[in-house]
From Swiss-Prot:
Name of the featured protein: Probable alpha-L-glutamate ligase 2
Gene Ontology MF, one: metal ion binding
GO annotation, biological process: protein modification process; SOS response; translation
Co-factor note (free text): Binds 2 magnesium or manganese ions per subunit.
Length: 299
C-alpha cells in the first residue's frame, strides 16, 4: 500500500516509528507536512499539491496533526477523505476531540464518567461557577491548551476567582473542573485502537506537581486496567469517532473519569512503558481497514 503520514515532524519518535513499522511490512510511506500542502477543490477531480507538484494517489493517510495547526491540518485531511483515501482518524473526529468543551458535552450525553465541569462567560457568574464544581481546590483549563500548558490548580476560592477573572479579562476560553484529590497526581493513559485498549500506562506527576503529562516531567509505568476502565476508554474514543485515541483517565472515588481524549497520542511513552509494538499494531489496523469501501466524510 501507499501510506501518507501527515506530520510536521519527520524526526519525531512517533512519526519515525510509524514509518519504520510500515516499511517493515512492505508498504511505501511518505511523510507530508500538511502546512506545505495546497488544494484544488472542484467538481471533476480534486487534488492536493506541494511545491507545484500534484501528490500521487494514496491508499491510506495517518494524521499526526499538532493542536496548533488543527484547522489547516484538518482541511488537508478532509481533502484526502474527499478523494476517497482511507483516514485512520477522520477530520470530524479530530475536530471533535480538539474542542475540549464539545468533547465533554458529547461524553456527558453518553453517560461517560467525567469530572464536574463548568463553563461561563460573565465575571458575575464566577462565584456560582466555583460552587458548581464543589469549591476550591479546583482546576482551571484553557480550552486551547495542550501537554499540561494552560492548566492551573487553584487551591483557594480567592485564588480561583482571581485566575478566572484574569483569563476572562484576556478573553480566553476556559473551563473549570473539580479537583480529583484522590488521584494523587496520577492519571492513566489508555491507548485505544479500534474497539480495544491495546496498551495502558500510569503517569505520575513530579513531587509538588499535579499535572502528570510526560512533557511536564511525569514518569510512566505499567498499569493493570479494570474492566470498567477499559470500557470507559473505548466508549470515549467511539464518542469522538476516533479509531486511534489516547484516553486519559483519573481514578476517582466514584469510578474512572475521563479528562481528555487525544486524537494524536504519542508513541514514545506508551511503547517505552509497556514494551509493546504500538506502531506495528496501528499499521496492521490500517491494512485491515484501508481496502474496505469508505464513503467521503461529511463536511
Amino acid at each position: 500500500m501507499r501510506i501518507a503520514i501527515l506530520s510536521q515532524g519527520p524526526e519525531l519518535y512517533s512519526t519515525k516509528r510509524l514509518v519504520e513499522a510500515a516499511t517493515l511490512r512492505g508498504h511505501e510511506v511518505k511523510v507530508i507536512n500538511p502546512l506545505e500542502c495546497y488544494m484544488n477543490i472542484n467538481m471533476r477531480q480534486s487534488s492536493i499539491h506541494i511545491g507545484g507538484e500534484e501528490l500521487p494517489p494514496f491508499d491510506a493517510v495517518i494524521p499526526r496533526i499538532g493542536a496548533s495547526i488543527t484547522f489547516y491540518g484538518s482541511a488537508v485531511l478532509r481533502q484526502f477523505e474527499m478523494m476517497g483515501v482511507y483516514a485512520l482518524n477522520d477530520s470530524v473526529g479530530i475536530s471533535r476531540s480538539r474542542d475540549k468543551l464539545r468533547s465533554m458535552q458529547l461524553m456527558s450525553r453518553r453517560g461517560i464518567g467525567l469530572p464536574i465541569t463548568g463553563f461561563a462567560n460573565k465575571p458575575s457568574d464566577i462565584p456560582d461557577l466555583i460552587d458548581m464544581v464543589g469549591g476550591a481546590p479546583l482546576v482551571i483549563k484553557l480550552l486551547e491548551g495542550t501537554q499540561g500548558i494552560g492548566v492551573v490548580l487553584a487551591e483557594t476560592r480567592k485564588a480561583a476567582e482571581s485566575v478566572i477573572e484574569a483569563f476572562m479579562g484576556l478573553k480566553a476560553n476556559i473551563m473549570v473542573q473539580e479537583y480529583i484529590k484522590e488521584a494523587n497526581g496520577a492519571d492513566i493513559r489508555c491507548f485505544v485502537l479500534g474497539d480495544k485498549v491495546i496498551a495502558a500506562m500510569k503517569r505520575q506527576a513530579m513531587p509538588g506537581e499535579f499535572r502528570s503529562n510526560l512533557h511536564r516531567g511525569g514518569t510512566a509505568s505499567l498499569v493493570k486496567l479494570t474492566p470498567e476502565e477499559r470500557s470507559v476508554a473505548i466508549r470515549a474514543a467511539k464518542t469522538m469517532g476516533l479509531n486511534v485515541a489516547g484516553v486519559d483517565l483519573l481514578r476517582s472515588n466514584h469510578g474512572p473519569v475521563v479528562m481528555e481524549v487525544n486524537s494524536s497520542p504519542g508513541l514514545e511513552g506508551i511503547e517505552g512503558a509497556t514494551a509493546k509494538d504500538v506502531a506495528g499494531a496501528i499499521i496492521e489496523f490500517v491494512e485491515k481497514n484501508a481496502l474496505k469501501a469508505k464513503k467521503p466524510t461529511q463536511a
